[in-house]
UniProtKB/Swiss-Prot annotation:
CDD domains listed in its UniProt record: YPP1 (cd23270)
Major place of residence: cytoplasm
UniProt name for this protein: Cargo-transport protein YPP1
Organism for this UniProt entry: Eremothecium gossypii (strain ATCC 10895 / CBS 109.51 / FGSC 9923 / NRRL Y-1056)
Keywords: Cell membrane, Endocytosis, Membrane
Length: 739
């Protein structure tokens, strides 16, 4: 095949995938394909005005396709047909669409692109006759590659219009792949068993290929149908498909389609290990094709879809022997995604510009199914790295989310996570502008975004703006609760916004005023989460399977919050009772906050006991910021005045703690060992913990240690970090708006 032909086929492949940037080697063909892209771009947008279609028609009329290749004539026939349909001229629409019939010779030269043109053509016809239907079933001999998402878009629309009695598709159109796909798309009662019978019939006629033979085309195509059917929705599927897939593996050699159906089946039915093993088979077979075909995957979107679908599992093991490695799998996903964007010439926001969406935003329009996949892939990469410090600081997280927004700009969840990351990296002004412009203007009832906005505004010395936001949101949420319009996560948000209100009251009016409002929190909790006899495993108030996603954990958080307020008021007795109440909430799990809050309670009266509590918490969670800072306060109790001037304490730390009545260290050697341990813990926090890195107290105590060690260079750096993060510290951690 000549280079020119390669370039043309690749340009057609790009168009079938929904791409809009070409390089066929023919200026005229590129111009035609670009116009086709623009027409479908606006066709996907239901709000396109008539004037836009008129402009596009004028541009189309400037192209004299009658003198061009048949390929250009075929594309332009569809372009004019679509334009006249959008302008309401059915006569001209039908005239132009009819031209494709005279160009059927293209099917032999460009079968995959012909499938796109034919399906698009029939979808824009006012009516699809029996002969038209039969032509499609004859001409589209194989299911499109998943990469050809524009072809799939039209194929699904076409199948939705096919007139055929149930189970009669094979009889009426022959035993072709589209006939089986039609029944899978319709999914009428009994289709599971019908498809299983059809698949077994095909399997019974199949034998393992000889060395010079290929796998059975019909069995390969049926497994492509099966993969579509298994992925179509979450309805129950027969477990007998497992045997069918296993038998198919026995009569095929390194089949991409069979391995894809296998990984889909096991992913659907919860066998993580087998899903992962089949994913690796699928990847290896795809890589084999790539090595033999100039470095290009045969169906890169299918591969991207497989990785995204399987790696979304929450129970992924870190490794399965030497066969599977989680980190490597996500690196492969990242590489496949990048390769797709590069080869298919889709616009990306570079990492270095990703934190400034308002200045660098872009809109990437592709067929809906591809848009969902790309958005899911970007968001999955974000989800797996969002708790890691390095990708947070190097803008990897904003990079993933910004590109997810480019492809799916209406997804509020992605937008909120983007705003949350901006806040986490202390791009506060950008976060505030983004929240107001891109979320709250569009969805005014997004309570988590209001909470995040209030926390961002709380950084200002004047807390009035933050306080007004919180009070307004609490009122709106109370009204929504009365009307039973609060979602599960909203109820958790409601509690934490109320706690934020109390912290603001404490800052603005004093701890006594906050304590007077404490009873309102308990009343709110009782209203949102009334006592019930429902089995806890089925508790509808749970956010997820983890202990910190239960309402008991939330109730404990309220008691710990109360204990901290009492500590800040110097009321040790009530603080102790609040901790005891937290312990009594549940015995199904252990909450480290019991140890940490006890540690702060004992800082003055029982420093050795406080040391034990903090050490116990750190043995389970070495980067727990509150425990590390508590340990530091035992080592540097005289720093309280200085620290108060440099960094506002977190709610748990509160006001300055008096110097302990007794020294928790037996001698100077004992203290030196504790300082060495504290140094390791603090440095671990700033190297691994997002919370720790942005906590001014962590940097302050590091500066004290560097001063003690006469490390002037790191001392100065730590002090600057302490001051910077003090100036950007919210009234409560941003994590309290993320559920």
């Amino acid at each position: 095949m000549s280079l020119e032909m390669d370039l043309i086929e690749w340009a057609l492949n790009l168009r079938a995938a929904g791409g809009g940037v070409f390089g066929s080697g023919s200026e005229e063909l590129d111009r035609v394909l670009k116009l086709h892209y623009r027409v479908t771009y606006h066709a996907f947008d239901r709000g396109t005005k008539r004037s836009v279609w008129e402009v596009l028609l004028a541009e189309a009329e400037k192209i004299d396709s009658s003198k061009g290749m048949e390929l250009e004539q075929a594309v332009m026939g569809n372009v004019f047909g679509i334009l006249y349909r959008q302008l309401g001229d059915e006569t001209e629409c039908a005239r132009w669409l009819a031209k494709l019939g005279a160009l059927r010779a293209l099917r032999g030269e460009y079968p995959e692109f012909w499938a796109l043109l034919l399906l698009e053509n029939v979808c824009y016809r006012e009516a699809i006759g029996v002969e038209d239907q039969q032509q499609v079933f004859r001409d589209v001999a194989r299911l499109p590659k998943e990469t050809h998402t524009l072809t799939w878009f039209y194929l699904e629309r076409f199948l939705a219009r096919v007139q055929c009695e149930r189970w009669q598709a094979v009889k009426e159109f022959g035993g072709v792949p589209l006939a089986y796909l039609l029944e899978a798309v319709r999914e009428e009662e009994g289709v599971d068993q019908w498809l299983l019978e059809q698949g077994r019939a095909i399997l019974s006629r199949t034998r393992f290929p000889a060395a010079s033979e290929k796998n059975s085309t019909m069995l390969e195509e049926f497994h492509a149908v099966l993969n579509y059917y298994l992925r179509k929705n979450n309805k129950p599927r027969s477990t007998e498909w497992e045997g069918f897939i296993t038998d198919s593996l026995g009569v095929t050699f390194q089949s991409v389609n069979v391995s894809k159906a296998a990984l889909t089946y096991y992913r659907r039915f919860g066998d993580t290990k087998l899903a992962l093993l089949n994913l690796l088979n699928f990847f290896n077979y795809s890589e084999r094709f790539r090595r033999m075909n100039n470095g290009f995957y045969d169906d890169i979107v299918s591969l991207l879809d497989a990785y995204t679908f399987v790696l979304q599992l929450t129970s992924l093991p870190e490794a399965i022997g030497d066969i599977f490695n989680k980190a490597k799998a996500f690196e492969q996903l990242r590489n496949i995604l990048q390769e797709f964007y590069r080869d298919y010439r889709l616009q990306q926001i570079p990492k270095e510009h990703s934190a400034d969406w308002l200045s660098n935003s872009a809109k990437v329009v592709v067929p809906p199914k591809l848009a969902r996949l790309l958005s899911d892939s970007w968001f999955l990469l974000y989800r797996i790295e969002r708790n890691s410090l390095k990708p947070t600081l190097d803008f990897s997280l904003t990079y993933y989310l910004a590109n997810a927004m480019c492809i799916n700009p209406l997804n509020i969840d992605v937008k909120f996570h983007y705003a949350y990351v901006l806040a986490s990296i202390r791009r506060i002004d950008m976060c505030i502008r983004f929240l107001k412009t891109n979320i709250l203007n569009i969805k005014p009832a997004d309570y988590r975004s209001w909470h995040l906005l209030a926390l961002c505004e709380s950084i200002q010395e004047d807390k009035d703006v933050s306080f007004k936001i919180v009070c307004s949101v609490l009122k709106a949420m109370a009204e929504a609760h009365e009307e039973s319009n609060l979602l599960k996560a909203d109820k958790w948000q409601f509690i934490h916004i109320k706690l934020t209100q109390l912290v603001l009251v404490k800052e603005m009016f004093g701890v006594k005023d906050a304590l007077e409002m404490l009873s309102e929190v308990y009343q709110l909790y009782a209203s949102l989460f009334p006592a019930s006899k429902v089995n806890k495993t089925k508790d509808e108030s749970r956010l997820g399977p983890a202990h910190n996603q239960t309402k008991e954990y939330l109730f404990q958080a309220i008691w710990f919050f109360s204990a901290r307020l009492f500590l800040q008021d110097g009321d040790a007795q009530n603080a102790r009772e609040a901790i005891d109440e937290a312990k009594r909430v549940t015995d199904t799990f252990t909450n480290l906050n019991v140890n940490i809050t006890h540690g702060y309670l004992k800082l003055h009266c029982d420093p050795k006991g406080a040391m034990s509590e903090f050490q116990n918490a750190l043995s389970f969670d070495p980067t727990n910021v509150d425990a590390v800072v508590g340990l530091a306060k035992l080592l540097y109790p005289e720093d309280q005045g200085s620290l108060e001037r440099i960094a506002r304490h977190r709610p748990i730390i509160g006001t300055a703690t008096p110097k302990p009545e007794s020294d928790p260290f037996a001698n100077s050697k004992d203290r030196s060992a504790a300082v060495a341990q504290l140094k390791m813990l603090l440095e671990n926090c700033i190297e691994k913990s997002i919370d720790g890195y942005h906590t001014p107290e962590v940097w302050w105590y590091l500066s004290r240690i560097y001063d003690e060690f006469h490390d002037n260079e790191r001392l100065e750096s730590a002090l600057w970090q302490c001051i910077k993060f003090h100036e950007l510290e919210p009234i409560r951690d941003f994590k309290y708006c993320m559920f």
